């Protein structure tokens, strides 16, 4: 008799995705982050659901409802901090996952890669909407500053901003709609994630060498299920350590002050995971130019498959490209640091140089290094 997992219509899908899936035998721990992102999404949806049961999306009660969750709801404090720090863990896993894709040439699976970029944008939108909900100072002013960027769009800009606000400033209508967006987007992310996996399973996984591994595949279960469980345990350990010992490490103290439209915080800045893009935005003195650079800093990922000039897919055997890749990582860390600093000397010039280097590395230096490496192969 054939096993039920291979015949049942629903179990067959799960079986082909998680059990009998042929997987390259040599994929490293950098391939663990896909499953960790799935775990992040489940954690965020569950904790978010329980928070939504007690939260009120109204300007007069939003801040106190979060305080009520932390003080009066059974284990509300841990649910709230798991959700806040879970978002940080989500972005850590996300950036490592993208970095892995860049290093090993996984972007050559173009459909998977483009859905991934769409996922990144959706997750960023969700995180931004979520940051507004506690209605602290940074929530209010962050929402004001970021939504105001749309006013840089010629002709329709200011109308568009007022349409998103639902009035002439960030107010009750804005908070209510941001709560609605924040609630619905994770389910859209889940749907996109399924499409992402669907496209991935059309081609199979890439591997560190970048060479097709069709002749050397092993079943996903038990080899990679056990590996993913180890990754998941380490992830849970990190998240719980962060939540229980340093819950406010990655947050902004200003968000413990209730939103006040009459008092602007000294330094308006987004959460740490947006600081690199914020630094690029700030480094251009022109408003529209800054907004375009901000968009391009993320959307540049879409063009990476087109910028592939190397004859080798992976960077495993390409020392020049490796050097430039790690320079890019250092540059992104520099941008993240600058984004959290006040707009004054020397941070302005450092931010501008780091922003130029970011685009230069991706658009010019890395494709050029690949061409040089191709020439060296002939020696």
Swiss-Prot record:
Role: Component of the ubiquinol-cytochrome c reductase complex (complex III or cytochrome b-c1 complex) that is part of the mitochondrial respiratory chain. The b-c1 complex mediates electron transfer from ubiquinol to cytochrome c. Contributes to the generation of a proton gradient across the mitochondrial membrane that is then used for ATP synthesis.
Q: Which cofactor does it need?
A: heme b
Q: PROSITE patterns of this UniProt entry?
A: CYTB_CTER, CYTB_NTER
- Residue positions annotated to bind heme b b566 are 97, 196
Q: Which UniProt keywords apply?
A: Electron transport, Heme, Iron, Membrane, Metal-binding, Mitochondrion, Mitochondrion inner membrane, Respiratory chain, Transmembrane, Transmembrane helix, Transport, Ubiquinone
Add the further remark from the entry.
Answer: Heme 1 (or BL or b562) is low-potential and absorbs at about 562 nm, and heme 2 (or BH or b566) is high-potential and absorbs at about 566 nm.
Topology relative to the lipid bilayer, per the entry, is: Multi-pass membrane protein
**MF GO annotations:** metal ion binding; ubiquinol-cytochrome-c reductase activity
Protein's name in the database: Cytochrome b
> What species is given as this protein's source?
Phocoena sinus
GO CC terms of this entry: mitochondrial inner membrane; respiratory chain complex III
Keyword Transmembrane tagged: yes
Could you tell me which Pfam families the record lists for this protein? Cytochrom_B_C, Cytochrome_B
